């Protein structure tokens, strides 16, 4: 194979297609067959890495090279080709043109590709590889452009996809996805269809528009990450973009989509006998198949762009989202590939906004938030033009923190902390410090005086109205300032977790020190008789005995016997919990070892819900200077079934704990951890029951489901009670935070909440009242 690809260095993952590690130091004997496969893969994968003037000549040369190998390697070539088509997002036109050129001289190969394409689409759908399925569907219009398929193929495709709207059993997510597939192909085929089939194309667009307008959008606000007035979801945005493309001065001319087939137009259209009929496409009929649920959620828009209704915006954003998906295991290659896209305009604003949008997606991002955060670190090192755009977006979000969903605000804080930790904590801290300062008392006093001196004259009435407006604005400013402080505290707390307190202090301006958490240290009050609470000598002596028995590793039976004989007036639960935490305070591995070693002792002592509540109280008191330790310790105690998931809900909903803890981030970490534990338990028991049916296993599963439903019901009721009561010292920002966390719980655990709401309709009233 003499062909040399001059299209530039491949920016994709090195292991994606041939499975062979690259690099030196491999002294194994070469397999000629594997060498051939590797070279062939490299040629097909790398074609078009850089959209240079040599692209067309490279495609032509590769087509001629592959023609010689097709008689013996057709299956291998198709394997590689379809992996590329379904993964390398902007290269779809290149591979269609390649197939078109081969089809001119070997129509049997073209026919095989068309038949296999139908199978690949079904397989991708069945495996829920929806990004791959979209690109495979998009390959159809490109094959029409390359004269491999007849023009009827695209309308047969549209008819098949839109036929789902005429069935009675389709789900909203399925219908959204199929309409999305139709809209996502139009920019690639619109110009071709506009010549002789514009009426048919308009009919397709109108059918999509009719469906989009008929959809229920009542819960849109529930999933809005940033409430700045932009409410279009993906389908609504695409429809506007496509109609704008159709109705503009140069209709259907799209930048950002390669058109290599135009260079070969004469060759590709030399004979209509080489065109193939698209076989009927079938889709999986599995009712349990879960289609993407994010197409009806409001898009994230923070930067004021004039190009929101430009189809080029969608194309670049779609490329980026595909790349994020296909390269999620290699963030460095992902960041490189994004900036190798064949687009003429600067894309920094779209890159920043798209990745933030993916990170802030509700109810959950596609990948862990850290993935998106790491990409920004990569961009800062390799693409300096991103830096001012990123900084501008971060400042906008901080200034408008009240417009962020609370769950998103939390993700924003964690991501920003991670970013700062990678760049020596450098930021324009002085600018932010000003927005944390409260309004002056003088301004408030002046406003109050004006109100008191108001009269019945029109002029004074106007002054009074203006003053009232000013007071309202001040209240909003106070709320927004409090929200910024909550955000700053979350950022700084996360920074301390990623590093340590003293280092953060050294790198922060002094005005921020007041928002730092205290220095983490255990509080063990049994060390000596001079402790502030003046514990009895008897209690201190018992703690010393217990610690000594732990240190000398006395047999567990002896320790259990000793604890059983401790006088009843001594708080044994507190004593045991704090002594175990003391021996485990050196490190988290010490803690795990201590809990595992003495789990039987705990279960002997903790006999009731009151005992478990006392255990939690003791944990909070011991680690009152470290919220991170509280989260970890409580989670471990739940994991080892020393306390139950619902015990954390009961603890936080106690009146004496609400004012102290309910607005703290670690509270919600504990609650989410407890809910996740119930989900894991139910999943494990379900799998176990499926493998081996028994009444005992079924009983355990039903019991666990009931316990989970009780936990969720008590949590929603508790939060509703807090929000409706006036007895707690909660400001407006605190109530906003609690209602935001309630919304987060409903969103995140919607499937678990549904049966709870159905059995207890009063919960719907709480949810509707406090999450709108």
From Swiss-Prot:
Source taxon at top rank: Eukaryota
Main location: nucleus
Residues covered by the MIF4G domain: 37-249
Coiled coil: none
UniProt-listed InterPro entries: ARM-type_fold, CBP80, MIF4G-like_typ-1, MIF4G-like_typ-2, MIF4G-like_typ-3
GO biological process: 7-methylguanosine mRNA capping; mRNA export from nucleus; mRNA splicing, via spliceosome; nuclear-transcribed mRNA catabolic process, nonsense-mediated decay; regulatory ncRNA-mediated gene silencing
Cellular compartment(s): Nucleus
Region (Disordered): 1-31
Family annotation (Gene3D superfamilies): 1.25.40.180
Gene Ontology CC annotations of this record: nuclear cap binding complex; nucleus
Keywords: mRNA capping, mRNA processing, mRNA splicing, Nucleus, RNA-mediated gene silencing
GO molecular function annotations of the record: mRNA binding; RNA cap binding
Record function comment: Component of the cap-binding complex (CBC), which binds cotranscriptionally to the 5'-cap of pre-mRNAs and is involved in various processes such as pre-mRNA splicing and RNA-mediated gene silencing (RNAi). The CBC complex is involved in miRNA-mediated RNA interference and is required for primary microRNAs (miRNAs) processing. In the CBC complex, ncbp1 does not bind directly capped RNAs (m7GpppG-capped RNA) but is required to stabilize the movement of the N-terminal loop of ncbp2 and lock the CBC into a high affinity cap-binding state with the cap structure.
Family to which this protein belongs: Belongs to the NCBP1 family.
Assembly: Component of the nuclear cap-binding complex (CBC), a heterodimer composed of ncbp1 and ncbp2 that interacts with m7GpppG-capped RNA.
Protein name: Nuclear cap-binding protein subunit 1
Species this chain originates from: Dictyostelium discoideum
